[in-house]
Amino acid sequence: MAKKDKTSVKKSVKETASKKGAIEKPSKSKKITKEAAKEIAKQSSKTDVSPKKSKKEAKRASSPEPSKKSVKKQKKSKKKEESSSESESESSSSESESSSSESESSSSESESSSSESSSSESEEEVIVKTEEKKESSSESSSSSESEEEEEAVVKIEEKKESSSDSSSESSSSESESESSSSESEEEEEVVEKTEEKKEGSSESSSDSESSSDSSSESGDSDSSSDSESESSSEDEKKRKAEPASEERPAKITKPSQDSNETCTVFVGRLSWNVDDQWLGQEFEEYGTIVGARVIMDGQSGRSKGYGYVDFETPEAAKAAVAANGTKEIDGRMVNLDLSNPRPANPQPYAQQRAGNFGDQLSEPSDTVFVGNLSFNATEDDLSTAFGGCGDIQSIRLPTDPQSGRLKGFGYVTFSDIDSAKKCVEMNGHFIAGRPCRLDFSTPRTGGGSRGGRGGFGGRGGFGGRGGFGGGRGRGRGGARSGNPNRGSVAPFSGNKVTFD
């Protein structure tokens, strides 16, 4: 009965294997299986890679690439089949336990045969694995997915056959059946691990191919995808760097000082005690001072209560104006503000004045009249201003006899007329902060300085009516004092008109 059960089990196992698409293995002789395995190994080593590629490419073209979901479903089906094969092996091992008491001679023969079959199967699996590694290294990542599926199916079928053979041939003892089952479990674990690794590598390679769009069929798809991803990242960096370089602002250059910026500060609400030197000392802390002047009244000689401070740079002038509202001089809070800048070309000022007052140039002479002079101007200021025009013979600045202050004009005498003409061309030049009016001076006429014959005598005492008035009028008083009828009344002459 036991033998009948064994034969029925073998038939059922073979039927299940044929239904699932497994390859039926002849069990007549074990030597035939060894020779067949060797022939398969030789044929696989002799075959070239190119026909495999062509077959696989044809398969790939005919059948679409399996998706990840289909691969997972196949894994689940594989696990189910493996579990069913294990259950069959366990049932066969239990049957072998019941039949272990038949004969010891058959057990020894079955031991040798089982060991030979297990060794032959292990050799076949090693050969298949080496071939798979070679194929995976030489073939592209896209074709590796379809190959792995086929190899996985072949392995499962081989395992089923080995499990069925071991179950049919392990009728010797319990220990042998346990060893075969443990070996089959270990092999299944190894195969599962290798399949998982291959699936992970194939998935990563397919991802890299989709990102890099490479059509190469080499096995180093990962390295190619890495290189392409690096090149793409470098291109992106370059693209980002190009607009950044274009958007870079140009180097900031310091703005040149505008010629219209003023360096003069107006100072208001000054005390009458403040003079030029005092005013300059009060503003030395803000920058280099070129000049300082307090505006004075020409008649009284007293300060008008304001002045000007000239700095070397506009920045110093702005710093001084920033102290407005906090600056005190001689106990008084002063007002500070920027003065109107001097025009670079003073000619418009001279032309405007000439249009307003009808100024006309006099006949050329060697003496130049300088009008609109500041009361603070000195002979040195005029010498510095007009020294470049020619050789200066003399400089005169008339003063008031009562106050001793300047009258606001002067005279500059040159050695020749050409130098004087050059000086007049500087009409509107600033001296001590004021634009000067330049003209040729007319020469003096004689006979009028002391009033002619009327001079210092006559009944008018000290020149009579002609007196000092004649001197100032350039002879007008002298002409009047020279009247032959000195002090007498002129006789009446004319027609007498009466009205009736």
Swiss-Prot record:
Function, as annotated: Helps the assembly of pre-ribosomal particles containing 18S rRNA.
Stated family: Belongs to the RRM GAR family.
Xref: SUPFAM superfamilies: RNA-binding domain, RBD
Name of the encoding gene: gar2
Protein name: Protein gar2
GO CC, alphabetical: dense fibrillar component; nucleolus; nucleus
Matches recorded under CDD domains: RRM2_gar2
Chief place where the protein resides: nucleus
Annotated localization: Nucleus, Nucleolus
Stretches with biased composition (Acidic residues): 219-233
Pfam families: RRM_1 (PF00076)
GO biological process: chromatin remodeling; rRNA metabolic process; rRNA processing
Entries under Gene3D superfamilies matching the protein: 3.30.70.330
PANTHER family for the chain: GEO13361P1-RELATED, HETEROGENEOUS NUCLEAR RIBONUCLEOPROTEIN A0
GO molecular function: histone chaperone activity; RNA binding
Sequence ranges of Basic residues compositional bias: 69-78
Biased amino acid composition, Low complexity: 90-120, 164-182, 202-218
Keyword vocabulary terms for this entry: Nucleus, Phosphoprotein, Repeat, Ribosome biogenesis, RNA-binding, rRNA processing
Residue positions, PTM Phosphoserine: S143, S144, S146
Domain of life, per lineage: Eukaryota
